[in-house]
Amino acid sequence: MENYQKIEKIGEGTYGVVYKARDLTHPNRIVALKKIRLEAEDEGVPSTAIREISLLKEMHDPNIVRLLNIVHADGHKLYLVFEFLDLDLKKYMEALPVSEGGRGKALPDGSTLDMNRLGLGEAMVKKFMAQLVEGIRYCHSHRVLHRDLKPQNLLIDREGNLKLADFGLARAFGVPLRTYTHEVVTLWYRAPEILLGGRQYSTGVDMWSVGAIFAEMCTRKPLFPGDSEIDEIFKIFKLLGTPDENTWPGVTSFPDFKASFPKWKREDTRKLVPGLERNGLDLLDAMLEYDPARRISAKQACMHPYFQAGSSAYSGRERLQPYP
């Protein structure tokens, strides 16, 4: 660790403390040091985790936060060295003026972002969404899932570009129920197949999270703010309707699905996200598709009409045929 000089603690992530630090081998380079707190610290760092993390160093995409180095210190401490970005999407949304649905909070000290110029209007939401799905497409094409996407791990640089952080960490270290400070890890962006106890899941879990984040960027409010797993499931069912074998073949076989669940009817997406253009509503529906086999992929999302110039009519639920 002699190559890094800690400047200040900047946060407490899912896996441990995050520090802003100076890279002493590169003049003027500021980095984020993520100290990974391992469950069994006395046993050292699992070799599987080291292997997984080493693969992430090979991932280079403008929409992903670069993993610059891995430092294995004292036998049982692991530090991940990332490029430094001082703002995440959650703080960005909170810094929006109250008149725009934000909370008017101050940006972190030292942030040079011009919120008045950037804001979070339709064009900015579309830009962030394009960068988000492109970053996910890149990761999925390298067989890397995120599994814990949320506004807190979408970082924004000083030019107002969005980058994904913490990709691949879930596979290396698991997704804990609580952070090391005993904070509950948020369920608001978790896909229904995980909430219902599914053991086999794929890239679709990330696309569900993107849908929930998309809606939140538009409305400035979380779409499914559950405070427990069952509350989260019911929040989803109340808005999207309780799924059955017709809407989601196989749903009744999930370990945590109960035939006694209340039967809610689906709300109109236009009411959930008022003001979103028709192509945006179409994309949101495709991301919040219950059946993971029919949920839009990141590659397909990149080519969605929402990201093209012009707009076409929103055709509602009947548009959602299985994606090829």
Swiss-Prot record:
It catalyses: L-seryl-[protein] + ATP = O-phospho-L-seryl-[protein] + ADP + H(+); L-threonyl-[protein] + ATP = O-phospho-L-threonyl-[protein] + ADP + H(+). Transmembrane segments: none annotated. The keyword ATP-binding applies. Residues 4-307 form the Protein kinase domain. GO terms for molecular function: ATP binding; cyclin binding; cyclin-dependent protein serine/threonine kinase activity; protein serine kinase activity. Pfam families: Pkinase (PF00069). Its EC number is 2.7.11.22. Keywords: ATP-binding, Cell cycle, Cell division, Kinase, Mitosis, Nucleotide-binding, Phosphoprotein, Serine/threonine-protein kinase, Transferase. The modification Phosphotyrosine is found at residue 15. Forms a stable but non-covalent complex with a regulatory subunit (SUC1) and with a cyclin. PANTHER family: CELL DIVISION PROTEIN KINASE, CYCLIN-DEPENDENT KINASE 2. Belongs to the protein kinase superfamily. CMGC Ser/Thr protein kinase family. CDC2/CDKX subfamily. Cyclin-dependent kinase that acts as a master regulator of the mitotic and meiotic cell cycles. This is Cyclin-dependent kinase 1. It comes from Ajellomyces capsulatus.
